[in-house]
Curated annotation (Swiss-Prot):
Modified residues (N-acetylglutamate): 3
Annotated positions of the N6-methyllysine modification: 86
Methionine (R)-sulfoxide modifications at: 46, 49
Subcellular location, record wording: Cytoplasm, Cytoskeleton
PTM comment text: Oxidation of Met-46 and Met-49 by MICALs (MICAL1, MICAL2 or MICAL3) to form methionine sulfoxide promotes actin filament depolymerization. MICAL1 and MICAL2 produce the (R)-S-oxide form. The (R)-S-oxide form is reverted by MSRB1 and MSRB2, which promotes actin repolymerization.
Protein name, per record: Actin, aortic smooth muscle
PROSITE patterns to which the protein is assigned, alphabetical: ACTINS_1 (PS00406), ACTINS_2 (PS00432), ACTINS_ACT_LIKE (PS01132)
Keyword Nucleotide-binding: yes
N-acetylcysteine PTM sites in chain numbering: 2
Subunit structure: Polymerization of globular actin (G-actin) leads to a structural filament (F-actin) in the form of a two-stranded helix. Each actin can bind to 4 others.
GO molecular function: ATP binding; hydrolase activity; protein kinase binding
Amino acid sequence: MCEEEDSTALVCDNGSGLCKAGFAGDDAPRAVFPSIVGRPRHQGVMVGMGQKDSYVGDEAQSKRGILTLKYPIEHGIITNWDDMEKIWHHSFYNELRVAPEEHPTLLTEAPLNPKANREKMTQIMFETFNVPAMYVAIQAVLSLYASGRTTGIVLDSGDGVTHNVPIYEGYALPHAIMRLDLAGRDLTDYLMKILTERGYSFVTTAEREIVRDIKEKLCYVALDFENEMATAASSSSLEKSYELPDGQVITIGNERFRCPETLFQPSFIGMESAGIHETTYNSIMKCDIDIRKDLYANNVLSGGTTMYPGIADRMQKEITALAPSTMKIKIIAPPERKYSVWIGGSILASLSTFQQMWISKQEYDEAGPSIVHRKCF
């Protein structure tokens, strides 16, 4: 450890799919690992192998063939606290190799996170990890910080949940936040389903990870879905091949854009919800008429599920069709948007003006977990 890191703040962004952790002031997270806890499916027979009863992150991923994988964060909200503790423990001690009792820690949470959840996070940080100070920030707000803005509407779509969060002068407007339980994991499941129609079978939790890789490498968003379907039907120009871990090669055609099209047409997976372009528009329409212009001009994309090629152009086209014809519409898709929540946290935690915002151990001891509602908004 170098000297200046003796009390640097830690930033830990816990997503449904990936946990991003690192030091405030850095421009990227040091540790990015899957938010997975795996437990063996079989009885250990070899003595002295040092088999553990649970594995976290990349180690769970690499041994996935013999484990049952569980995600403690579902739809952006922590549902399994014991496993979550394992993930935090892993990120502090194994990934960052720090003692959490020496570092103020910034955590992130989903918009509209249940109150009891923030309290529980606060309690675990102070009582289990003995942090000297902590803060809980809303993910979408951090993404906006990372893009250098204080006003805009963020479309934050990760592995477990998608949110539209309008923010004005640094304040999220809770009445206009839209939540859509459709994100990367659902797209992976949908891709598994449509690949099955092609005769490729993917079923286990381990095979799902292979499909996720196919999705990340080959999928894209079509500007005009019907046109693209016609092109795919009449020629093989859109086909790509992918080599599976066992050497078998599979071909994928219109699945490449049918999979992410679900974001715009959730009916593909039997959801009654509006697509991401409509939820963005609805969210803007719930805001005060005077600030809508600023929101239309600052549509910020964030999260791994906004990484599909073509998504920004398609959003531009769809929102232009919904909005008043004279409105200037701008979609901002920063190249580092996969990690923009973490980057925003890194910026926030290293601001000198932020230092009085931390919840200190002393304040926690005096007021208890509910302090988090007063200090973090």
